[in-house]
Amino acid sequence: MTEAELPEPPAGGGTKKAAELAFDTRVEMYRQVGVDLFRLPGFNEETVLRLLSETGRDLSRWPSEKHFASWLSLCPGTKKTGGKVISSRTQPNRNRAAEALRRAAVSAGRTETELGAYFRRKKAQKGPAGAVTATAHKLAKLYYVLVKEQQEYAPESAANYEAKQQQRTLQKLTKQAAALGYELRAVASGT
């Protein structure tokens, strides 16, 4: 993909900032990184510039996306004793890259993409703070793979994500029912 073929960024409802940059950030970041990071939901100029300034283009100092997310303190620090989980809070830190990813996660939560659906599902499970951390963790892993592997981001719609999630839930319930000696059967929804 050449710079001229870069698709338009997703429509955002933002206002112009007082300190606008004098160059086209999308084109320059594409030239520097080789991937259009602005296609990730929630990513804007500030997020991309902050991540690149904090991590650099070379992500080889982190062996995997899990190490990268851990460095950002976006992984739960599960503490166990006697086989029982006593705490699973993330480590507190002042990492500016993690803060940028958290802001991007909040923004991504308002979109109609798979990350937006993921955010809403996690918000129902863990509350707003847990959803922000979980979505920021997912964004960190996506960022790592896109930059390191030079892959383009292929977004999925929220409807497709929800359908896959429903299919996973159905498979899980079918397996649990079979383990208990029951069989699940679909009921006609004609009421």
Q: Which sequence ranges carry the predicted segments?
A:
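A detector of single, family-specific signature residues
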Residues: 1-191
